[in-house]
A protein has these predicted regions:
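Acyl-CoA thioester-binding alpha/beta core of soluble enzymes
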Residues: 1-42, 85, 97, 115-116, ...
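N-terminal helix-loop segment corresponding to the beta1-alpha1 unit
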Residues: 1-189, 289, 336, 358, ...
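Generic structural signal for residues in well-ordered beta-strands
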Residues: 33, 71, 196-198, 313
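Substrate-binding strand-loop-helix patch
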Residues: 59, 204-206
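Active-site-adjacent beta-strand anchor residues
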Residues: 74, 96, 198-201, 247-249
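Conserved Rossmann-fold dehydrogenase catalytic segment
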Residues: 157-165, 188-204, 223-230, 271-274
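Short helix-capping/linker segments at secondary-structure and domain boundaries
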Residues: 187-190, 264-266
C-alpha cells in the first residue's frame, strides 16, 4: 500500500533534529527523502553517542533518519553546489536549517531556485527568525531558556529546568511538517510553490498555549509550580505509602469522586475546596491533606481505586515501562527497519498508513 506522499521528492539539507524529524515524518508518509551530508563527516548527530545501534550508528541519528537515502555533497565546492542545485531543481520540497544567508551565497537560496522552479516548496528552519535574530544560534536549550519554557519548568522558584528532551526542536519539526503539507495542498490547487519559514522561538511561544495566552490576554507572567497545573487543582504528583502517583482532577465532579474514594467526602463541600478556583487558591494545603490520606496505601492500590472511581490517575513510568504500556495497549510503538528498532510513526491512517522502507542510512564513502 502506497503512502499519501508517494511521488513527492524531498531534498533534505537539514541537520541534527528539527529538520530531520520533519523529513522523516514525510518519508514515513511515502515521500522519497534524499539527505545531503558533508563527505566524510555527515550529520553531526552521527557522532552523538553512546548509545549506539547494533549497526554502530548513534541512536540519536537513527531516531530521526529512517526512510531516507543519503548523498555526500561538499557544498563548499562549485561542483558540490552544482550537484546540490540539480537535486533541488528536481525536488518537490527542500528543507534546510543553515544560518540565514548561507545557502544564498552558494546559489541555493529560495529566490534563485524558485525562479527556475516555481513549484518548489522551500522550508527554512531557524532559531530566532531571519530578521533581527538571524545571528542567534538555534540551540534547543538556548531557546528553552530565552523563550520562557524554563521559567515555568522545575521543582520550584529559583530552580529553572529544561525539558528532558529537545522538545522545542521536535515541536518546530512538527510545525515545519504542517507548513510543508499546507504548501503542497496549495500547490495542488494553484501549481505554485512557496517558502515555508519556521523558527524555534515562535514554535515554543505557540506551544506554551495556556501560559502564553495568560500573558498576552491578561498580563499574567507565570512562575514555576513544579508538577502542579497553574489553572486547575488537584493536578499534581502526590506521595503515597511507597511511591509517587499522578492525580489529574479536571472538574468538581472528579474532585468529589476522588475525596469519596479517599474516605474524606466532606472535603467536596469545604468552602476552601468546593470549586476549582478555591482549590487553586488553596492548592498547597489541599495537597498536604490529600497526601495524608494517600499515605495509608501504596500507589498500586490507590491507582486501582481512584481509576475505578473515574478519576484520571497513573504511575510515573520510566521509558521501559512506558513502551511496555504501549505494547500492552496494542499500540505497536516499535518498528524494526533493516535491523534497527525505531519508534513507530505516531499517526494511524486507515487508507494510506505509514510505511517503513529504509533504515537509517550509513554515510556514503564519497
Amino acid at each position: 500500500m502506497s503512502g499519501p506522499l508517494e511521488g513527492i521528492l524531498v531534498a533534505d539539507f537539514s541537520r541534527v533534529l528539527a529538520g530531520p524529524y520533519a523529513t522523516m515524518l514525510l518519508g514515513d508518509l511515502g515521500a522519497e527523502v534524499i539527505k545531503v551530508e558533508r563527505p566524510g563527516h555527515g550529520d553531526d548527530t552521527r557522532a552523538w553517542g553512546p548509545p549506539y545501534t547494533e549497526r554502530g550508528q548513534s541512536t540519536y541519528f537513527a531516531g530521526v533518519n529512517r526512510n531516507k537515502t543519503t548523498r555526500a555533497i561538499d557544498l563548499r565546492t562549485p561542483q558540490g553546489q552544482a550537484e546540490a542545485r540539480t537535486l533541488a531543481l528536481s525536488a518537490d520540497v527542500l528543507v534546510e536549517n543553515f544560518k540565514p544567508g548561507a545557502l544564498e551565497r552558494m546559489g541555493l537560496g529560495y529566490a534563485e531556485l524558485a525562479a527556475a522552479h516555481p513549484g518548489l516548496i522551500y522550508c527554512s528552519i531557524t532559531g530566532f527568525g531571519a530578521g533581527e535574530g538571524r545571528d542567534l544560534p538555534g540551540y534547543d536549550l538556548l531557546v528553552q531558556a530565552m523563550g520562557g519554557l524554563m521559567s515555568v519548568t522545575g521543582p520550584g522558584p529559583g530552580e529553572p529546568t529544561k525539558a528532558g528532551v529537545a522538545l522545542v526542536d521536535v515541536i518546530t519539526g512538527l510545525h515545519a511538517t504542517v507548513g510543508i503539507l499546507a504548501a503542497l495542498r496549495h500547490r495542488d490547487v494553484s501549481g505554485q510553490g512557496q517558502r515555508v519559514e519556521v523558527n524555534l522561538l515562535s514554535s515554543l511561544l505557540s506551544a506554551l498555549v495556556n501560559q502564553a495566552s495568560g500573558y498576552v490576554a491578561a498580563g499574567v507572567v507565570p512562575g514555576i509550580l513544579g508538577n502542579a497545573h497553574p489553572s486547575i487543582a488537584p493536578y499534581d504528583v502526590f506521595a503515597t505509602a511507597d511511591r509517587p502517583l499522578v492525580i489529574a482532577v479536571g472538574n468538581d465532579g472528579q474532585f468529589g469522586a476522588l475525596v469519596r474514594e479517599l474516605g474524606a467526602p466532606e472535603l467536596a463541600s469545604d468552602p476552601d475546596y468546593a470549586t476549582n478556583p478555591a482549590r487553586v487558591a488553596h492548592r498547597e494545603q489541599l495537597k498536604a491533606r490529600l497526601e495524608a490520606l494517600l499515605a495509608m496505601q501504596g500507589a498500586d492500590e490507590w491507582q486501582r481505586r481512584i481509576t475505578g472511581a473515574g478519576v484520571p490517575c497513573g504511575p510515573i513510568n520510566d521509558l521501559a515501562q512506558a513502551f511496555a504500556l504501549a505494547e500492552s495497549l496494542g499500540l505497536a510503538p516499535v518498528v524494526t527497519v533493516e535491523g534497527t528498532p525505531t519508534v513507530a510513526h505516531p499517526i494511524t491512517l486507515s487508507q494510506t498508513p505509514a510505511t517503513y522502507r529504509n533504515g537509517p542510512p550509513d554515510l556514503p564513502s564519497s
